[in-house]
């Protein structure tokens, strides 16, 4: 955020602005919400910024230091609505509350920052995206390698990775999608992250190795980090230490919900770089939206926990066939139970995030209600799960648990419909505490007492307009019409005169008011105490609650995959340690869902003797769709899903690379051709014999001869050096001659039928070569003038006959 010099001389400012500037200087990079009564007000550049971001009125608040004070504000009771918008925009906010009213009207009210909100450290339900993880990340670079750490405070997840290249770092950032990134002041690769919304430069001291090591051991109550696999991994220790320190300082508290550190072994999952994720549109489409993605088709989970877990799985398909086969076996076993299980799971609330708020002691009364309703349905869930004969489902069932003690406590202690916040009272249930019930009865009976007092006095004084009312400023008062004031006894004390009425007080009424107000205050204090005790009682169950939340999430995902398999006619894939991919009558999982006509099924066979498939055919003929569907089917199989094919055998895949489509990166001075060459270079350097490589129209963007030469040499490198499983589409017919020279290459094509200037695509892959690209016929579909198309046809005949 840009800073303006707004304090030439502190002495010339008003006391309130002096206080504001003093607080603002402690949080220069954040918007300061400064409480003024029932409003949060922002001044100077903060006011201008929030006015622009939220489209609220920019006004002024008088003068200070001989200058107008720009001001914008939001009501305190609506602050969460505005905070949610700001967090989504990547803004951070410091909340400054009034601390104590002063008896002297001229004396400045004391204020202090009571809460800091940043995009990566929020845990409040209203500030979080329901179906997305909310990671904050830290990066440390040394010797061209990176330590990368992520933390989701709302889930209690803390993880680290060691990354060996900037390209892999970009891929990991894309996979985890952190809402906030911390980096050291000497970080030389800022360009990798500068396009993200919220990045923060931190002092090198915050990445100090010794301090980080001590902080991590202190957090986990250990004397060594060996148990987490990072004892001598200085890169990740620095990143994790900085991250932990920052999150603690932002939350102004310890982090009891962070119970373990997970080391992410990159080799456990199928590697996909940034370009691959983007072109395959796994969880985001090319426009950055969620529609028309693999996730949009597969993710019909019924809990927010399950939705987040499935998206994590989609971004990290596994290489561990044992885990994958367990998932496939579970999906198969759940086929006969998914309807009744989904009915129950729809009643499961976000136990994962409730757990974190419980551990942080920020859980709201409504969190307890949601937790209670979730625990109430667990016995019914167990009854169904016990019917399913699956070892993995049994393991999940045992992890879910019952929590009878916690449920009993919540039923007794929390009202059926509590207020939103403990400070409003009405949270603790009746009969839970005798003293609280007695204090509440005073207030409840007060209405009857006041009513009786009013009727008695009205009858005694014979005043028709006699009424007893209450407001927060003067408390209980007697209101009488001015025409009856001559009937008022002398012991009635006048407290306010209005146009047509007068207001009075009497000692008896004041005494009762003090009794009621005192009981209300004592009642609220007791409720807060009892509320805190509930956290203490639940604390020993927190770890099991976290495990239960994870088990419920996985169950939701597996039940969802079972439903998808039946609804979309998917087949259970065979996972083989052998080399290759065999798919019979496969379909594109996303495209088939949006077609009004049946999807044309196609097969593929990749093996040690047929490592490369060269595909020719017209644009829009189905080449790119065909290549993408193979990669998407591999990903689906790798997360435990069934796949859109009649038969699927998936061998061991370590990486997926794609070079399908590219936009010019003009901001870095890269053309389409340069971007293509950089991506191909990355593939040639990193693909292995177990990698799946998809390349669309290699060699575009330069002269035909040069493009063909590059395509030829890159293809031979992939065949003989990388030995990867490769699908390559091309318009260079000459490239198909590789089949004659390299024994591992096979030519296939997509065909079309042409009549006059019109074309019909068949979308069926066949052996052999397509002699024509049908470019002019495809161009006719774009609406080019007939004269242009006719002229092009003539020129084509002329060139071909030359």
Curated annotation (Swiss-Prot):
Transmembrane segments: none annotated. One of its GO terms (cellular component) is cytosol. Pfam families: MutS_I, MutS_II, MutS_III, MutS_IV, MutS_V. One of its GO terms (biological process) is mismatch repair. Keywords: ATP-binding, DNA damage, DNA repair, DNA-binding, Nucleotide-binding. It comes from the Bacteria. ATP binds at residues 617-624. This protein is involved in the repair of mismatches in DNA. It is possible that it carries out the mismatch recognition step. This protein has a weak ATPase activity. Belongs to the DNA mismatch repair MutS family. This is DNA mismatch repair protein MutS. It comes from Buchnera aphidicola subsp. Acyrthosiphon pisum (strain 5A). The gene is mutS.
């Amino acid at each position: 955020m840009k800073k303006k010099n707004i304090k030439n001389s502190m002495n010339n400012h008003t006391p309130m602005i002096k206080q504001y500037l003093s607080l603002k200087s402690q949080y220069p990079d954040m918007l300061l919400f400064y409480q003024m009564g029932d409003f949060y007000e922002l001044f100077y550049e903060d006011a201008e910024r929030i006015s622009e971001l939220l489209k609220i009125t920019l006004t002024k608040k008088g003068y200070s230091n001989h200058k107008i004070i720009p001001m914008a504000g939001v009501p305190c009771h609506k602050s969460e609505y505005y905070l949610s918008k700001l967090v989504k925009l990547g803004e951070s906010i410091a909340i400054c509350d009034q601390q104590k009213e002063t008896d002297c009207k001229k004396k400045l009210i004391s204020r202090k920052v009571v809460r800091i909100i940043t995009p990566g450290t929020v845990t409040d339900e209203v500030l979080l995206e329901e179906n997305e993880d909310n990671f904050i990340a830290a990066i440390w670079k040394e010797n061209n390698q990176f330590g990368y750490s992520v933390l989701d405070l709302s889930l209690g997840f803390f993880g680290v990775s060691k990354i060996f290249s900037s390209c892999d770092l970009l891929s990991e950032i894309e996979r985890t999608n952190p809402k906030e990134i911390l980096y050291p002041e000497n970080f030389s690769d800022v360009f990798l992250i500068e396009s993200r919304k919220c990045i923060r430069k931190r002092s090198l001291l915050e990445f100090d190795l010794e301090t980080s090591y001590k902080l991590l051991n202190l957090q986990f109550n250990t004397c060594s980090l060996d148990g987490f696999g990072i004892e001598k991994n200085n890169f990740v220790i620095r990143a994790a230490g900085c991250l932990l320190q920052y999150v603690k300082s932002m939350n102004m508290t310890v982090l009891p919900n962070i119970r373990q550190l997970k080391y992410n072994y990159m080799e456990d999952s199928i590697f996909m770089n940034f370009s691959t994720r983007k072109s395959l549109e796994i969880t985001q489409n090319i426009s950055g939206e969620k529609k028309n993605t693999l996730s949009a088709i597969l993710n019909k989970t019924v809990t927010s926990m399950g939705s987040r877990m499935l998206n994590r799985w989609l971004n990290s398909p596994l290489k561990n066939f044992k885990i994958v086969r367990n998932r496939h076996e579970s999906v198969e076993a759940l086929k006969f139970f998914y309807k009744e299980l989904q009915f129950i799971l729809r009643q499961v609330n976000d136990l994962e995030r409730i757990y974190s708020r419980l551990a942080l002691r920020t859980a709201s009364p409504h969190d307890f209600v949601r937790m209670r309703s979730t625990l109430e349905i667990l016995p019914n869930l167990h009854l169904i799960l016990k019917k399913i004969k699956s070892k993995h489902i049994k393991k999940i069932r045992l992890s879910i648990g019952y929590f009878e003690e916690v449920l009993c406590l919540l039923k007794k202690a929390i009202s059926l419909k509590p207020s939103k916040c403990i400070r409003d009272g009405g949270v603790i249930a009746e009969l839970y505490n005798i003293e609280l019930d007695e204090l509440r009865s005073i207030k409840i009976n007060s209405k009857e007492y006041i009513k009786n007092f009013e009727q008695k006095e009205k009858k005694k004084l014979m005043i028709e307009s006699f009424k007893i009312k209450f407001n927060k400023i003067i408390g209980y008062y007697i209101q009488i019409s001015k025409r009856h004031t001559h009937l008022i006894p002398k012991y009635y004390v006048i407290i306010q005169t209005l146009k047509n009425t007068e207001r009075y007080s009497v000692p008896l009424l004041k005494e009762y008011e003090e009794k009621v107000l005192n009981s209300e205050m004592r009642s609220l204090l007791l409720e807060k105490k009892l509320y805190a005790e509930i956290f203490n009682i639940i604390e020993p169950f927190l770890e099991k609650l976290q495990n239960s939340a994870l088990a419920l999430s996985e169950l939701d995902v597996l039940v969802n995959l079972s439903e998808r398999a039946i609804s979309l006619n998917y087949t259970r894939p065979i996972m083989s340690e052998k080399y290759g991919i065999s798919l019979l009558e496969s379909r594109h999982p996303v495209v088939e869902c949006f077609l009004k006509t049946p999807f044309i099924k196609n097969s593929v066979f990749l093996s040690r003797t047929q490592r490369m498939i060269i595909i020719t055919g017209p644009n829009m003929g189905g080449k790119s769709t065909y290549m993408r569907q193979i990669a998407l089917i591999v990903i689906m199989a790798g997360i435990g899903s069934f796949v859109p094919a009649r038969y699927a055998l998936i061998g061991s895949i370590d990486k997926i690379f794609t070079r399908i489509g590219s936009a010019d990166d003009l901001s870095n001075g890269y053309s389409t051709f340069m971007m293509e060459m950089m991506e191909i270079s990355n593939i040639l350097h990193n693909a292995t014999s177990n990698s799946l490589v998809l390349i669309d129209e290699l060699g575009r963007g330069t002269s035909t001869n040069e493009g063909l030469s590059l395509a030829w040499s890159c293809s031979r490198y992939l065949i003989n050096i990388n030995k990867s499983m490769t699908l390559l589409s091309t318009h260079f017919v000459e490239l198909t001659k590789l089949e004659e020279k390299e024994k591992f290459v096979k030519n296939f094509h997509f065909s079309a039928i042409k009549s006059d200037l019109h074309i019909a695509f068949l979308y069926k892959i066949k052996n052999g070569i397509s002699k024509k690209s049908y470019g002019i016929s495809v161009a006719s579909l774009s609406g080019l003038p007939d004269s242009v198309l006719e002229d092009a046809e003539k020129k084509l005949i002329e060139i071909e006959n030359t």
